[in-house]
UniProtKB/Swiss-Prot annotation:
It is found in: Cell inner membrane. SUPFAM superfamilies: N-terminal domain of the delta subunit of the F1F0-ATP synthase. It is a peripheral membrane protein. This is ATP synthase subunit delta. One of its GO terms (molecular function) is proton-transporting ATP synthase activity, rotational mechanism. Disulfide bonds: none annotated. F-type ATPases have 2 components, F(1) - the catalytic core - and F(0) - the membrane proton channel. F(1) has five subunits: alpha(3), beta(3), gamma(1), delta(1), epsilon(1). F(0) has three main subunits: a(1), b(2) and c(10-14). The alpha and beta chains form an alternating ring which encloses part of the gamma chain. F(1) is attached to F(0) by a central stalk formed by the gamma and epsilon chains, while a peripheral stalk is formed by the delta and b chains. F(1)F(0) ATP synthase produces ATP from ADP in the presence of a proton or sodium gradient. F-type ATPases consist of two structural domains, F(1) containing the extramembraneous catalytic core and F(0) containing the membrane proton channel, linked together by a central stalk and a peripheral stalk. During catalysis, ATP synthesis in the catalytic domain of F(1) is coupled via a rotary mechanism of the central stalk subunits to proton translocation. Its main location: membrane.
Length: 177
């Protein structure tokens, strides 16, 4: 079982990352669940076990899935077929769901800036943090004029100091050492 999970994880992670980037998590979850059901079908299962060339297997499998799987989903299925991994589709779908559940958790991020941030700047910061942390982010913004310019972002154990005050402090430390 651990071996199947190990094999499935990179495929699930790649699909999840792609789905996040394209804001298509729900459609990818549906596609993977459908493809997993197809792979467990009693007629299809023996074909996955061997004998068929990978390109023919991918073509057949994609044909069975039909419109339920979009072009990017078909590309994933082709790669999995080329590597003889279509049998682990149920585990890929399960791993994908686990990644979705983890991602659905929200993390609070504190953003301290020298001046008030516009809603567009807050949105940009939020999107960047969501990509980096692979979680939904709720921003708590505050103003500290002593930063001179820039921002300090704190999210969990991640601290990003992009303030002028921080840069001056690091420069001072470097010069004193």
């Amino acid at each position: 079982m651990a071996e199947i999970t190990t094999i499935a994880r990179p495929y699930a992670k790649a699909a999840f990352d792609f789905a996040i980037e394209n804001n298509a998590v729900d459609s990818w979850a549906e596609m993977l669940n459908f493809a997993a059901m197809v792979s467990e079908n009693e007629t299809i299962k023996p074909l996955l076990a061997g004998g068929l060339a990978s390109n023919k297997l991918a073509e057949l499998f994609i044909g069975v899935c039909g419109e339920q799987v979009n072009e990017q989903g078909q590309n994933l299925l082709k790669v999995m077929a080329e590597n003889g991994r279509l049998e682990v589709l149920p585990a890929v779908a399960q791993q994908f769901v686990e990644l979705c559940n983890e991602w659905a958790k929200e993390i609070e991020a504190t953003v301290v800036s020298a001046v008030e941030l516009t809603s567009e700047q807050q949105q940009d910061i939020s999107v960047s943090l969501e990509k980096r942390l692979a979680r939904k982010v709720k921003l708590n913004c505050s103003i500290d004029a002593s930063l001179v310019a820039g921002v300090i972002i704190t999210a969990g154990d991640l601290v990003i100091d992009g303030s002028v005050r921080g840069k001056i402090s690091r420069l001072s430390d470097t010069l004193q050492s």
